[in-house]
Amino acid sequence: MFLARFDSHSVLTMGSMNFIERELEGLDPDILLAGINGSRLGLYNYDERLVNVTGNPPVIIPTHWDTFNLPYGFSQEANVEGKLIPFRDFVAEISPESRVVVPVHLEQFAIE
């Protein structure tokens, strides 16, 4: 886990392993890089706990969802259907003001 602060913004990057809420309280990042690897599914309410303790960040970018050890041209559709879409939909339920941004490899995007 890392917290990067620059100007008046902050980015919190999380893996997909457990955490202790009191260690994250008050961080309130503008951007949360949320690890959504399958290992988090065995942890009690991981997604909900993470989003809530970080103050329902305005922007959430899922990471660790792809099969990263295959060529870039390899289809990630199974991971999109099995990991990204369920995560995006769940975040929409628990934090409707948060925007889930799904990056595309080697494509730039701007966060306002």
What is each residue range found by the language model?
Residues M1-G26, G42, E107-E112:
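Core dinuclear metal-dependent hydrolase active-site scaffold
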Residues L12-M17, L32-N37, I60-W65, V102-H105:
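Active-site neighborhood of phospho(di)ester-bond hydrolases with catalytic His/Asp-centered motifs
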Residues I20, G35, S75:
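Conserved short-loop catalytic and cofactor-binding motifs
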Residues E21, D47-E48:
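Amphipathic, non-transmembrane alpha-helical secondary structure
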Residues E25-D28, L50-N56:
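Short, conserved loop/helix-junction motifs that constitute active-site signature segments
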Residues L27, I31-Y46:
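Active-site-proximal segments of metal-dependent phosphoesterases and phosphodiesterases across multiple
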Residues V53-E112:
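Binuclear metal-ion centers of metallo-dependent hydrolases, dominated by the metallo-beta-lactamase
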